[in-house]
């Protein structure tokens, strides 16, 4: 009888081999203190954070910290349920209204993480009989959102406008199409030619 976890043995063996050969365990890095949006004390040493998601440097902004403390005082440490179950917090409505107005849209919706946004939106919008045309180097969360739904996924070569147009041209007339691009590709750091692609 096979154990459910047997399939992980090759990965375990590889990791143990790397460690035995003097490789460093990537999970041994401990961040003891964050000093700034780009620096922390890791394993006792000051370290530059090259993989941070702190894109706008707001984690140490005094106004953001004060608002976070106030939100904890007003609402506690969590919503204790979904919007459908418990309702929507006034702060969520306020930020969605501000985003809607700023971008000149009919509606805006916030998610806790970008990953959740991609999961929640993509498979909801594109379903059976629809097509998702996306850059091959899109973030894993985008791919996961595509996998959750029933739409046909059609990838194209990274940042290649001609390849994208060719894929779009092959989609049946009348089918729903969702084109997914990233403004800045988080995995590569390069920028999509959005003006030309839209």
Range-by-range predicted roles:
Residues 13-75:
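N-terminal "arm"/small-domain region of PLP-dependent enzymes with the aminotransferase-like
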Residues 57-58, 85-88, 140, 161-162, ...:
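Short, small-residue-enriched loops and turns at beta-alpha junctions
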Residues 66, 71-113:
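Conserved N-terminal alpha-helix of the aminotransferase class I/II PLP-enzyme fold
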Residues 121-140:
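Conserved PLP-anchoring active-site segment centered on the Schiff-base-forming lysine
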């Amino acid at each position: 009888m096979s154990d459910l976890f047997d399939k992980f043995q090759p990965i375990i063996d590889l990791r143990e081999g790397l460690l035995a050969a003097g490789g460093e365990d990537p999970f041994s890095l401990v961040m003891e203190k964050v000093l700034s949006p780009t620096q922390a004390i890791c394993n006792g040493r000051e370290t530059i954070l090259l993989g941070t998601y702190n894109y706008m440097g707001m984690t140490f902004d005094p106004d953001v910290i004060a608002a976070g403390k106030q939100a904890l005082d007003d609402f506690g440490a969590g919503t204790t349920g979904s919007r459908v179950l418990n309702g929507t917090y006034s702060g969520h409505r306020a930020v969605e209204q501000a985003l809607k107005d700023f971008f000149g849209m009919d509606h805006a919706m916030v998610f806790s993480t970008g990953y959740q946004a991609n999961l929640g939106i993509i498979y909801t919008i594109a379903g059976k009989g629809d097509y998702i045309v996306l850059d091959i180097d899109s973030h894993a969360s985008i791919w996961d959102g595509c996998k959750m739904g029933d739409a046909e996924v059609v990838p194209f070569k990274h940042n290649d406008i001609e390849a994208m147009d060719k894929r779009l041209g092959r989609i049946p007339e009348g089918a729903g199409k969702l084109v997914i691009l990233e403004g800045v590709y988080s995995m590569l750091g390069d920028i999509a030619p959005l003006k030309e692609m839209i």
